Amino acid sequence: IAVAPDLEAISALSPGPFGGNMDVPDVRPGNKVYLPVWNEGALFYTGDCHARQGQGELCGVALEITSRVTVSFEIIKGGGIEWPRIESEDRLMTVGSARPMEDAARIAYTELIGWLEDEHGFSRLDAYQLLTQAGGLYVGNMVDTTYSLVASIDKQYLVRG
């Protein structure tokens, strides 16, 4: 699931800020995916759908299927996100894609800290501390040209008192 990147062309195997081949199991029905947009009309595309995939897509393939996908779109003007975000009923998640893996983790956590700051009233330091104590991190893709990692926080921790 992706939009056209701010590049002339990119391999369909490569994930990045635009989404792409992230191989993240949380990109699934019922969850919202937020993507930054660089081109008029976004030029959205989807593919490589899986019936099932473990974290990391260890052997390079998941349970690959043909699929018919129905999506709905909402334009959020001035959203200002830099990397894909995923929202489920109970978690906020951000995706970072890079090599080495540490860079992917850094991107994912930086984006999640920004989300907590911008939309949930946390200071940068408080968001960093919260993720240190209650955040999650998993590998979506570790077999393609670029690794994808997902940083997350349960929404129960977003209640400020």
Feature locations, PLM:
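Glycine-rich anion/phosphate-binding loop at the beta-strand->alpha-helix junction
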Residues: I1-K77, E117, R124-L125, L130-S152, ...
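A hydrophobic, small-residue-rich beta->alpha segment in the mid-to-C-terminal subdomain
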Residues: K77-L130
